């Protein structure tokens, strides 16, 4: 990656709340990650799938030691370093897969520290998601959709869904809830297998329904890109988790 390309990606991350790196997961690691993920998904209980109907699945990467290889993959560190984060701290990770015929993912943001002033003033992400896509992903099978810039500015969806992480929204108790609706400003983020999408945890995002008969799988890994720069209260809270 050239310095100009890296700078462009960083500016997009700061401005829009996300950026994309194409074809950065090598074919062998992609294949093995898909195999392990499929095994875990095949073993998932029907109860789990019903509870996570909107998300699809939410399986911790701690369920299989293989994922240590993906977490430590040079491609992840290199992408974060290119964005100006040479010393990130890993937090958690999940296998998130929308089965064929599953509904949209609800609109939400994933940051929790809104009682800290820096949550509103920081230009760079305090927490970032790294989404590794294992299959080609389009609007037909559940690609990511985002509301650009909502990591730094308010949107009506913040009021519509002040607390999106509820059991009712995950299970799609009310399919007509505003959390699932398309938004005029939404931007689709279609990707190819092996692509990496990096985003700010404060960004409002969701995913389209999977209208195909095949599962759509992404491995979402969470990092603190600039751990040493976080405020003491936030680091203290995270150290307890």
Model-based region annotation:
Residues 86-93, 103, 126-132, 142, ...:
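Generic beta-strand structural signal
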Residues 64-69, 181-187, 206-208:
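Active-site rim elements
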Residues 1-15, 21-122, 233-234, 240:
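Non-heme Fe(II)-dependent double-stranded beta-helix
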Residues 43-49, 53, 157, 193-198, ...:
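Non-heme Fe(II)/2-oxoglutarate
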Residues 117-139, 190-193, 198, 222-226:
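Short, conserved beta-strand element in jelly-roll/cupin
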Residues 137-203, 228, 240:
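Double-stranded beta-helix
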Residues 34-37, 146-148, 213:
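Short Gly/aromatic-enriched secondary-structure transition segments
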Residues 26-27, 95-100, 112, 137-139, ...:
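Short, solvent-exposed loop/turn segments at secondary-structure junctions
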């Amino acid at each position: 990656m050239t310095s100009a390309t890296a700078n462009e990606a960083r500016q997009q991350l700061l401005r829009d709340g996300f950026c994309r790196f194409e074809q950065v997961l090598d074919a062998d690691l992609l294949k093995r990650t898909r195999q392990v993920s499929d095994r875990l998904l095949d073993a998932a209980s029907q109860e789990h799938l019903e509870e996570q109907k909107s998300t699809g699945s939410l399986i911790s990467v701690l369920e299989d030691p293989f994922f240590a290889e993906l977490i430590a993959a040079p491609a992840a560190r290199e992408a974060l370093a290119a964005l100006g984060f040479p010393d990130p701290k890993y937090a958690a990770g999940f296998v998130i897969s929308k089965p064929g015929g599953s509904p949209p993912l609800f609109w939400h943001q994933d940051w929790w520290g809104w009682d800290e002033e820096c949550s509103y003033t920081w230009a760079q992400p305090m927490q970032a998601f790294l989404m590794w896509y294992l299959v080609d992903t389009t609007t037909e099978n559940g690609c990511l959709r985002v509301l650009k810039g909502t990591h730094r500015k308010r949107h009506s969806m913040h009021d519509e869904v002040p607390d999106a992480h509820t059991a009712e929204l995950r299970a799609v108790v009310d399919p007509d809830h505003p959390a699932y609706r398309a938004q005029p400003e939404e931007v689709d983020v279609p990707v190819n297998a092996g692509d990496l999408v990096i985003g700010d945890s404060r960004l409002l995002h969701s995913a389209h329904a999977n209208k195909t008969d095949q599962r759509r799988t992404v491995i979402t890994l969470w990092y603190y890109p600039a751990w040493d720069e976080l405020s003491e209260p936030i680091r203290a809270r995270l150290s307890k988790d």
